[in-house]
């Protein structure tokens, strides 16, 4: 059945500046600071891996920019002991007690025909009215950080036509691998009633010494430079409990020679994923374990360039499977050892040309092992399971005097199956035959907001001015072309005798979505103060 959906969305955000600010993923504030980095006015705090705790922006008070006089948030100093307490363990840490309040941020949407939404955390935006409310606070003291920022969501979840389910639940996804309950936990609809949900959101406890950090909590992770469709991880799904450790963005100097060779960043984490209530009836497989590794390097000899590589591994929930967090050779065929496995990796580059306000980026993702192994298999067919996101951002100056600036963003994403699978079996980057819930948490994909198996073309233009931002978005995408390909794999293209014509029965039924979306953010400029206020 061919359907074209047009979605119009507008959101209003109350946000609070600061010269030194720590911002939530994809918030209005973080997007604005990222725009400043495109102009070379501020240095990005993270190269590849970022959460709310990592997104710490340090803007000089003397830097002139559109929102310079706005109140974007203030860090309060409750106790300052920097003069009385000095030791190696506090070097590089907050020497005293500081606090910050977040939000509240209230998001609302109304979908007239079918579910639509992306990169919205625990919120599943079904047909009808949807809303999300988040607020919180952060406390820092002597290297310790405590953040409480939960998310409360509601979906009216009105009825709409769905396809036949491939799982025990009648609301499950409409296709998968082979037998029932095999492929992905991605409900078409979360039951037949309106529902509320509480998520811990960006909540965590953390300890940081200089740039070494470790923490436990539920903060969402964003990997890579993508603005809409991150390949391996974003804030598209509900959060999950995890432990992480690593090195935040750090300058590297060769000892004695005092040569600066660039910045590095490294993070490793493990967490617990949960099945939705609308998949199978087997309670023994309700949880999976996720392991992740993220590495990045920004060479000093190529200004603005960042190279990165990421790896994730999903295994069955068993404490014994913690050993698979390290990607050594013995852990590359986990499924053969009874743990189940779904390993994926991505790598790419992000290059900012600050003098001209230009950024280009790309990320390639790989899944599964190529037939005939490495390197022969990739020499024979290098596109096996390959997915990608490519993007470009450009800053424009409309009026320096009135502080009006523009930002053009274009992103292209494709996660359709590589065509060698036409000779093998149906495939989807987000599905798996051992981790049968696929690459999901609580029924939503961990990344790639528009879904794996399709393609997206996205364009937006934002105008920043002293009172806020106005943005217009135009996009179109096919959410899951792999479903069509899966039907075609074991079929003939044309058979007049048996009345078979795949072009008429499947190609002409592809689902295409068109998005036209305005958005406005309004900023208050009352009582501008310093980033740090002493109480």
What is the predicted function of each stretch?
Residues 170-191, 195-196, 219-298, 310-339, ...:
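Surface-exposed coil loops of outer-membrane beta-barrel proteins
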Residues 4, 106, 198, 298, ...:
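Exposed, low-structure sequence patches enriched in small/polar residues
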Residues 1-25:
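Bacterial Sec-dependent N-terminal signal peptides
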Residues 117-121, 155-157, 187-188, 212, ...:
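Sequence/structural signature of outer-membrane beta-barrel proteins
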Residues 122-126, 136, 159-164, 181-193, ...:
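Extracellular/periplasm-exposed beta-strand and loop segments of Gram-negative cell-envelope proteins
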Residues 20-129, 135-142:
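N-terminal periplasmic/intermembrane-space "pro-region" immediately following the signal or transit peptide
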Residues 23-24, 95, 139-143, 208-211, ...:
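Short loop/turn motifs that connect adjacent beta-strands in outer-membrane beta-barrel proteins
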Residues 139-178, 301-305:
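Carboxylate/His-rich catalytic cores and anion/metal-binding grooves
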């Amino acid at each position: 059945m061919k359907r074209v959906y047009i979605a119009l969305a507008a959101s209003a955000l109350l946000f609070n500046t600061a010269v030194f600010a720590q911002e939530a993923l994809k918030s209005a504030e973080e997007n604005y600071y990222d725009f400043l980095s495109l102009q070379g006015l501020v240095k990005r705090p993270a190269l590849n891996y970022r959460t709310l705790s990592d997104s710490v922006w340090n803007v000089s008070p003397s830097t002139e920019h559109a929102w310079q006089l706005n109140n974007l948030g203030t860090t309060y100093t409750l106790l300052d002991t920097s003069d009385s307490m000095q030791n190696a363990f506090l070097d590089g840490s907050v020497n005293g007690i500081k606090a910050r309040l977040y939000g509240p941020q209230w998001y609302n949407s109304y979908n007239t025909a079918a579910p639509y939404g992306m990169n919205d955390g625990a919120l599943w935006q079904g047909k009808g009215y949807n809303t999300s409310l988040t607020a919180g606070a952060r406390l820092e003291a002597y290297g310790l950080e405590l953040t409480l920022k939960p998310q409360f969501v509601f979906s009216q979840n009105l009825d709409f036509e769905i396809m036949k389910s491939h799982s025990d639940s009648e609301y499950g996804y409409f296709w998968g691998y082979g037998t029932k309950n095999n492929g992905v936990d991605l409900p078409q609809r979360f039951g037949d009633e309106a529902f509320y949900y509480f998520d811990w959101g960006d909540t965590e406890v953390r300890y940081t010494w200089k740039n070494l950090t470790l923490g436990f909590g539920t903060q969402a992770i964003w990997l890579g430079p993508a603005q809409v469709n991150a390949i391996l991880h974003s804030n598209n799904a509900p959060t999950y409990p995890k432990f992480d450790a690593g090195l935040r963005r750090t300058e590297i100097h060769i000892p004695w020679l005092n040569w600066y060779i660039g910045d590095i960043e490294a993070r490793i984490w493990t967490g617990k994923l949960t099945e939705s209530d609308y998949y199978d009836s087997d309670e023994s497989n309700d949880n999976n374990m996720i392991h992740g590794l993220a590495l990045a390097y920004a060479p000093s000899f190529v200004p603005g360039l960042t190279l990165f590589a990421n790896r994730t591994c999903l295994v069955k929930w068993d404490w014994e499977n913690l050993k698979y967090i390290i990607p050594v050779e013995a852990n590359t065929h986990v499924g053969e050892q009874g743990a189940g496995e779904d390993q994926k990796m991505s790598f790419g580059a992000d290059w900012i040309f600050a003098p001209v306000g230009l950024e280009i980026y790309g990320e390639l993702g790989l899944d599964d092992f190529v037939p005939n192994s490495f390197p022969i298999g990739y020499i024979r067919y290098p596109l096996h399971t390959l997915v990608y996101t490519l993007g470009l951002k450009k800053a424009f100056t409309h009026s320096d005097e009135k502080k009006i600036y523009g930002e053009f963003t274009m992103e292209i994403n494709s996660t359709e199956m590589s065509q060698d699978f036409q000779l093998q079996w149906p495939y989807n980057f987000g599905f798996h035959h051992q981790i049968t819930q696929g690459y999901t948490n609580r029924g939503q994909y961990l990344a790639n907001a528009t879904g794996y198996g399709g393609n997206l073309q996205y364009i937006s233009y934002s105008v920043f001015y002293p009172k806020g931002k106005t943005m217009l978005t135009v996009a179109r995408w096919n959410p899951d072309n792999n479903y069509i390909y899966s039907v075609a794999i074991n079929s003939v293209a044309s058979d007049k005798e048996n009345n078979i014509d795949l072009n008429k029965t499947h190609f002409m039924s592809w689902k295409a979505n068109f998005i036209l979306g305005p958005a406005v953010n309004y900023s208050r400029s009352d009582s501008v103060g310093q980033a740090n206020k002493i109480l």
